Amino acid sequence: MKIRTRRVALVLPFLALLGCSKGADKAGAPKLTIGFSLDTLKEERWQRDRDLFVAECEKRGARVLVQSANNDATLQNSQVENLLTQGVNVLVVVANNAKTAATIVETAHKSGVPVVAYDRLILDSDLDVYVSFDAVRVGEQQADYLVKRRPSGNYVLIGGSPIDNNAHLVRDGQMNVLKPYVDKGDIKIVSEQWAKDWQPVEALKIMENALTRNRNDVAAVVASNDGTAGGAIQALAEQKLTGKVLVSGQDAELGACQRVVAGAQTMTVYKPIHLLAAKAAEIAITLGSKQPLPAAPRTLNNGKREVPAFLIDPIQVDKDNLAATVIKDGWQKLEDVYKDVPKEQWPQ
């Protein structure tokens, strides 16, 4: 009897540990599990999204399983299937391909799992909700900043990935601003290309070709994000045109912020990711808990339905307000952004 009693005493704590390992909360109920499927983690921006989103979910008592597809739509579909087999309650997706990701929504719904499109709209699907920044407004802010400073001349447009719906929305916003100037003949668009996977090396090639064809006569480059801006600026530097040609960007990445204060990049569009991550976490937990979704301020048609959309306003940033926005928010550190600038020139 003594031996049997001792065995029971040893087994009971072990069983308690097993219960904890399954992610039970203090009351013994299992935690809500969120699957977060990202297209890529190559860019600084997406690493920040991952970390902030996970932190926001954990703060609310949920756990997050993260997968990154390395810019591969087929791999992303496979990873989503894996997340579903692990029993996630809700799926949050940064889609590689806006159209083929419809399969992800269909597969998730067959398992009774709702889907949140994070930052990138998923087309032609019964998507549950979309949480993002206003991508059209991003493009408008980029073009607006440049045309106010160069209302005439040759313009180069470098878009993002052609299979990313956001890239097209940004381009729509750019053209909302540029078209009246083009129609009047003040601005001539001499190159209008897309950079595969938003890659800087693709932007470099596009910019090199544009400079060659136009004998370096370029007034401005409407680059759709900071990565493509960096590629374009590399091509400009090779022709000793750094700072002479206006260049836009998006994301307020560290390298871009350094280029802005140095005068190589004219502006960037800052998107407060902490607001996006918090809203996405709130929506995901609401859906995963089978609670009613709060009323969305607007809807967006994805080709199949009007999708409830929660869109956050971006912020136009240049060297004059960078410290009051990007640095004040803690997105970048003052000493990192200004590391190549004499300290007496740092903002006070």
Model-assigned labels for residue ranges:
Residues 1-10:
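Bacterial N-terminal signal peptides that target proteins for export
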Residues 9-17:
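Bacterial N-terminal signal peptides
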Residues 20-348:
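A residue-level marker of the well-folded mature domains of exported/periplasmic proteins
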